[in-house]
Amino acid sequence: MLMITSFANPRVAQAFVDYMATQGIILTIQQHTQSDVWLADESQAGRVRAELARFLENPADPRYLAASWQSGQTNSGLRYQRFPFFATLRHNAGPFTWAILLICIAVFILQNLLGDQPVMIWLAWPYDPSLQFEAWRYFSHAFMHFSLMHILFNLLWWWYLGGAVEKRIGSGKLVVITVISALLSGFVQHQFSGPWFGGLSGVVYALMGYVWLRGERDPQSGIYLQRGLILFSLVWLIAGWFDVFGMAIANGAHVAGLATGLAMAFVDTLHGRKRA
């Protein structure tokens, strides 16, 4: 299935769905924070988007009202979740987003049960030449977190940004961003502080950079990050360099992650800009 658009007003969404039904195209609505309109037959996407553009120009056109009457529906056709908060958590993230989130939680529980050191011995960046062929270590450092605030902050951003990328662009793209940014941010942080570090923040900063620049250069992608949030991330980044918070922060990983995300977004939007 392909998500076509989202409407803040569920009645407007229903009007568009009703009209498309009269054109022989079946759309469905999933109600979460907004009314998401989905298309099952992706081969019809071009026609649906063309009709959507006309609909948005004048949603009050009588033909749309007539379509709603023609559908014979006296209700909105929407199904509301009994627990909308949990429905939002579930539907705003894909399987890879949830897999990483659950792995991080499981590792955090192990750290609290066994202590940080035993877990780091297995998951930390290679701290001895004999470990350099243990390939998982170049990525598994991202699963470790050292305080409740640390893991909550990272996983909230991971769910918000990673979920958006996975839902709008696909799991493959999120996997690529995660793997590349974990590797590069880990390498840079290792140069700064040695192998004893952890956290998903390098990947999170990569997602911040990717989502913001991809949204600026390619609005059609459906992902974006408000400029206020990217400004907040930059302030947090600068504050970390000057030790404003008085705690150990993986500044090298943050900078490397952000640069990685920006670079990947630039490359992904380069061809589209050239065609334009």
Swiss-Prot record:
Protein localization: Cell inner membrane
Single Gene Ontology MF annotation: serine-type endopeptidase activity
Major place of residence: membrane
EC number, UniProt record: 3.4.21.105
Protein name in UniProt: Rhomboid protease GlpG
Catalytic activity reported: Cleaves type-1 transmembrane domains using a catalytic dyad composed of serine and histidine that are contributed by different transmembrane domains
Organism this protein belongs to: Klebsiella pneumoniae subsp. pneumoniae (strain ATCC 700721 / MGH 78578)
Membrane topology classification: Multi-pass membrane protein
GO cellular component: plasma membrane
Record-annotated active site: 201, 254
A GO BP entry: proteolysis
Transmembrane parts of this sequence: 94-114, 142-162, 169-189, 192-212, 229-249, 252-272
Primary role: Rhomboid-type serine protease that catalyzes intramembrane proteolysis.
Similarity annotation: Belongs to the peptidase S54 family.
PANTHER family (UniProt xref): RHOMBOID PROTEASE GLPG (PTHR43066:SF26), RHOMBOID-RELATED PROTEIN (PTHR43066)
Keywords, comma-separated and alphabetical: Cell inner membrane, Cell membrane, Hydrolase, Membrane, Protease, Serine protease, Transmembrane, Transmembrane helix
